[in-house]
Amino acid sequence: MQDPRISLNKLGEYMTAPTPSRRKRIVSDQQAPQTFIAARYKDAREAIVDFIVSGMSDRSGLLSLASRLRKSRDGSEFAINDRIASADAIESFIQAVDDIDLGNCIAVSMPGTTSQGMKIAGVYVSVRPDIYLRNWVTGEIEGALKLHFPKTSPLTSAGAEYVATAMRVYMELEQGNSHVDHRRCYVVDVPTASVTVAPKAYVRKMKDIEVACEEIAIRWFSGSAAA
């Protein structure tokens, strides 16, 4: 059996899931991820990342891309619907732009195939920020940004704080970046146009995450995560 693993966004959802059955389903889905789900919002993710990397100035260009995606009828029904969903996501993200402050940083994207994560209580948590924020003078990494897209499972503000906290700890402790600013650790819940930053204090939240990962590992190996 594969070792227990979970994406950081799903861990954030798990932390605030309202029912045991929802937590059970999250673990089950991580055991057998669906390829078509992982492929969703590809156009939106690429467009938003490019927009941030270029300095977040060309909003009209981003909206024009959303319009083209919405009008395109090429490919399968899934491809058409996914482009429409990506267009919706882009238009929603535009509403959140003013809450993202790059400060003295430049935004740097990472290849989508790059594996980035950490072990917490025996569970591999895939962190994979969409953007790193690097000080344009010193070159030091000061923060990161992670996007969350699904309309059906938006991150609550509490869940997003857990995601931002774990991302901050990953950069500081796993990568050894000593200049990380919690105010530059962003989580954007795209469908709700909500922007959350990591809280200043993180020890208690990381303890909560550790306990949750212990629970995930138990579900993973006991078979209780099965749908």
Annotate each PLM feature.
Residues S86-A89, A160-Y170, V203-C213:
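Well-ordered, non-membrane alpha-helical segments in soluble/globular domains
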